[in-house]
């Protein structure tokens, strides 16, 4: 018999740094998840991606067991890392803060491909370029 999912929790947590402290602990506690069990398993699974923010989707079942799926880091995080900046522009149409190349955009699009609803890499690249422009980045050939 299949277990029924009673709750789905979505979080963005730094890789390898999940702790029972807020915001992770309260979100998991409300869902009835074993907080220490989740943090140990998440940290072990994401230890190789240190420094990245990892989105995670946690499915909670009737018997309070859970499983989770880690996604690829958000496009904005990957773009900031590629451009070497801390944050995007507050006024992206006025102030440009960084430049990324088409090759960097293609690399990010290939990384994100499994999580994007794009038919091919070119469509994924257009999505990533749009994110870059909205952050105040210039996309160069």
Curated annotation (Swiss-Prot):
Signal peptide: none
Protein family: Belongs to the universal ribosomal protein uL11 family.
GO molecular function list: large ribosomal subunit rRNA binding; structural constituent of ribosome
Subunit structure: Part of the ribosomal stalk of the 50S ribosomal subunit. Interacts with L10 and the large rRNA to form the base of the stalk. L10 forms an elongated spine to which L12 dimers bind in a sequential fashion forming a multimeric L10(L12)X complex.
GO biological process: translation
Membrane spanning stretches: none
Name recorded for this polypeptide: Large ribosomal subunit protein uL11
Disulphide bonds in the chain: none
Top-level taxon: Bacteria
Processing after translation: One or more lysine residues are methylated.
UniProt xrefs under Pfam families: Ribosomal_L11 (PF00298), Ribosomal_L11_N (PF03946)
UniProt organism field: Ligilactobacillus salivarius (strain UCC118) (Lactobacillus salivarius)
Taxonomic lineage of the native organism: Bacteria, Bacillati, Bacillota, Bacilli, Lactobacillales
């Amino acid at each position: 018999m299949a277990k029924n999912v009673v709750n789905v929790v979505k979080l963005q947590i730094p890789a390898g740094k999940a702790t029972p402290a807020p915001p992770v602990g309260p979100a998991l506690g409300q869902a009835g998840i074993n907080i220490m069990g989740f943090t140990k398993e998440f940290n072990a699974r994401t230890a190789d991606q240190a420094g990245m923010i990892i989105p995670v989707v946690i499915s909670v079942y009737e018997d309070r067991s859970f499983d989770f799926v880690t996604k690829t880091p958000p496009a904005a995080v990957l773009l900031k890392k590629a451009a070497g900046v801390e944050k995007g522009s507050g006024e992206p149409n006025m102030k440009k803060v960084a430049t990324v190349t088409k090759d960097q955009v293609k690399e990010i699009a290939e990384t994100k491909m499994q999580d994007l609803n794009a038919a091919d890499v070119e469509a994924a690249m257009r999505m990533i370029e749009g994110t870059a422009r909205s952050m105040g980045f210039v996309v160069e050939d």
